[in-house]
Amino acid sequence: MTSEPTDPKRQAILDGATRMFLAHGYRNVSMDKIAQAAPVSKATLYNHFDSKNALLAAVISSLCEALLQTMTQATIESDDVENNLTQIATSAVDLIYAEDALAIYRLVVAESPDFPELGQLFYQSGPQAALTQLEDYFRRLNAGGSYNIADPVFAADAFFSMLRGDLHVRCLLTKTLRPSADEKKRLVSQVIAFYMRGMLYAKS
């Protein structure tokens, strides 16, 4: 799958908005400040995004883009289920433990009591999109006749939950804590091995 050409103005706005949200939080950032940070005119900003909510949703979607592209490529281009899931898990771990992704997660949790729409916006723009793609993949495996996955919804949720686990909580609570490349690789390997034995039932 080839990604669409990036609009330089849109990307500048997303980069500026990401910097502002992470530095100042959601409530303390105005559309005027984002326009200045980009820097673009207010007219250009509103031509791309009509509200601060829409802009935050785009920031979250942008962070998730690489994972969603990997999922699409892996599940369409190859019949090797274990390899496909390894690619998806590797991309997911890179996203889950990325500094910006952790910071956005903290921001949404901190701001949600006063801006309850942020939690739903975050979920729809990030985790839900990934879950839906993986659920669809598991349903296709069932339909193909080679696998019998009893509950594709639970199976998809369990997959991403195992990649987060206690480590994700500790990284959220300790800003300096990050898994090394070897630790992430080991996490992926262990999750895939457990998953292939315990969650996906290949028909003999």
List PLM regions with ranges:
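All-alpha amphipathic helical-bundle segments outside canonical DNA-binding/catalytic cores
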Residues: 121-126, 142-160, 185
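Amphipathic alpha-helical linker/stalk segments
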Residues: 57-88, 96, 100, 104, ...
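Short secondary-structure transition hinges
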Residues: 94-136, 177-181
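C-terminal peripheral helix-coil segments that are non-catalytic and often amphipathic
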Residues: 91, 132, 136-143, 158, ...
